[in-house]
Amino acid sequence: MTKEINIKNVKIGGKNSIVIQSMTNTKTEDIKSTLQQIQNLYNAGCELVRVSAPTFEAAKALKTITKESPIPVIADIHFDYKLAIESIKNGASKVRINPGNIGNDEKVKEIIKVAKEYNVPIRVGANSGSIPKELETLPKIDALCESALKEVRLLEKFDFENIVISVKSSDVIETIKAYEKISKMTDYPLHIGVTEAGTYEWAIIKSSAALGYLLYKGIGDTIRISIAGDPVKEVLAAKKLLISLNLRKGIQIIACPTCARTTIDVEKWASIIEKRFSKVEKNIKIAVLGCVVNGIGEGKDAEIGIAGVQNGFLLFYKGKIVGTFKKEEIFQVLEDYIIKVEVE
């Protein structure tokens, strides 16, 4: 089990639930746009948000952003240790530093001094694209882990243990092996993710393959599904991944792939129902099936199911037929049965 640490009011590690994280892609200096995006992420279910601080203007903007953000803000720092110090002083609840470019021991020592004063954790974020030169001759997985652990040992040397670690690669297998390796070498909380995972479809596939495996094995305390695009999609995908692994409560939609027997637009209705009940925080499966031929059989693992019939739906509950309903009635009926599941 990993250590428990606090990121402002959010606890990670130990027996705590897996925490969903994302990152803004607005200009941090544009405080209004950044706060709006953070609010959108929060509304989608984000619990920690990372914000890049590449300039002193951006670091100073964190003073307002951290005060008005509904969730803890993590400052992402590269190259200049002074930006980490400025970010902490302006309210960052955590800082991420890259061991491949943050600088020498004395610079790290200065960051630690301020992090201790403000009780702010440091994430040592190693990734495959910025391995220190002295480690480049090692096998990639060994280099990733040693890059992170070398920086961790430096933090520990200065009596700092408020640490989170990540060892991300853009390759699925490398990511899995690196996290498996480092999880056996330390008990610090692990932030897991596939770095530079790509555009939506590739990012979902690669992240699900790597993170799904790691989470199933009990590895990971915070997660990010990195997508080139709207970060809100990262949060929605992460939430669904956790629900699918029974690591978070929520509605799961079971839907058939459709065939010539289909009497309804399954994709349309499944999407509408999913969106309508996305805020329900109960472990409930709803099946949306195109016809009655295999409807009950295919949806028998679902608490509630609907199958298309002429001019409406056949509704079944826990494997038994309830009755037929018109399309305009179905949402109210589903709501009634969701409440029924919650009560029973």
UniProtKB/Swiss-Prot annotation:
EC number(s) stated in the UniProt entry for this protein: 1.17.7.3
Entry binding sites for [4Fe-4S] cluster: C256, C259, C291, E298
Cross-referenced InterPro entries: Dihydropteroate_synth-like_sf, IspG_bac, IspG_bac-typ, NO2/SO3_Rdtase_4Fe4S_sf
Single GO MF annotation: 4-hydroxy-3-methylbut-2-en-1-yl diphosphate synthase activity (ferredoxin)
Cofactor binding annotation: Binds 1 [4Fe-4S] cluster.
Associated pathway: Isoprenoid biosynthesis; isopentenyl diphosphate biosynthesis via DXP pathway; isopentenyl diphosphate from 1-deoxy-D-xylulose 5-phosphate: step 5/6
Record keywords: 4Fe-4S, Iron, Iron-sulfur, Isoprene biosynthesis, Metal-binding, Oxidoreductase
Keyword Oxidoreductase: yes
Catalytic activity annotation: (2E)-4-hydroxy-3-methylbut-2-enyl diphosphate + oxidized [flavodoxin] + H2O + 2 H(+) = 2-C-methyl-D-erythritol 2,4-cyclic diphosphate + reduced [flavodoxin]
Biological process annotations from GO: isopentenyl diphosphate biosynthetic process, methylerythritol 4-phosphate pathway; terpenoid biosynthetic process
One matching Pfam family: GcpE
Gene3D superfamilies given in the database record: Dihydropteroate synthase-like (3.20.20.20), Sulfite Reductase Hemoprotein, domain 1 (3.30.413.10)
Enzyme class: oxidoreductase
Cofactors (names): [4Fe-4S] cluster
Family: Belongs to the IspG family.
Database matches in HAMAP family: IspG
Protein task: Converts 2C-methyl-D-erythritol 2,4-cyclodiphosphate (ME-2,4cPP) into 1-hydroxy-2-methyl-2-(E)-butenyl 4-diphosphate.
Full protein name: 4-hydroxy-3-methylbut-2-en-1-yl diphosphate synthase (flavodoxin)
Organism of this sequence: Thermosipho africanus (strain TCF52B)
